[in-house]
Swiss-Prot record:
Keyword annotations: Cell inner membrane, Cell membrane, Membrane, Transmembrane, Transmembrane helix
InterPro entries: DUF986
Name under which the protein is recorded: UPF0266 membrane protein YobD
Gene designation per UniProt: yobD
Domain of life assignment: Bacteria
Length: 152
């Protein structure tokens, strides 16, 4: 096993740990989930570049008769990238005392101001940071509003 294979295993393990945390652990942290809303994805250009570069590496490894283990590890890395960037849906998860946004826990008392932009983006102003929440379904903004009023 080469150093390249070890690095690939490390990256695959990191992506797998992130996927498991995002899918199974985070919804169970900090109490029961009150509301979980699907968000719009960010630009997919970065993901296409990543998966494309890994596909080029797979092609290069196969045509130069590289190690079969490296080809399998690159394929697993491409599949993990495809899952994280294309299949997994980003979500905002509301709990009793706060919410998870982009895998970060934010308590409700940190919200200083909330606005709704003309294009349906909920803007939450924290102490030193501004969150731009783009929901997939515009009707979910009303659910978020009702939940935040209920918890304030």
């Amino acid at each position: 096993m080469t150093i390249t294979d070890l690095v690939l295993i490390l990256f695959i393990a990191a992506l797998l740990a992130y996927a498991l945390y995002d899918q199974f652990i985070m919804p169970r942290r900090n109490g029961p989930t009150q509301l979980s809303i699907a968000l719009l994805r960010r630009s997919r250009v970065d993901s296409v570049i990543f998966v494309g570069l890994v596909a080029i590496l797979i092609y290069n490894n196969v045509t130069s008769h590289g190690a079969q283990m490296t080809t399998w590890l690159l394929s697993a890395l491409a599949l993990m990238g495809f899952y994280i960037f294309w299949i997994r849906t980003p979500r905002i998860i509301f709990k009793q005392h706060g919410f998870f946004f982009a895998n970060v826990w934010i308590e409700y008392n940190r919200i200083k101001e909330m606005n709704l932009s003309e294009d349906g983006v909920l803007v939450m102003q924290l102490e030193q940071r501004r969150l731009l929440i783009r929901v997939r379904n515009i009707d979910d903004l009303e659910k978020i509003y009702k939940l935040l009023i209920e918890n304030q």
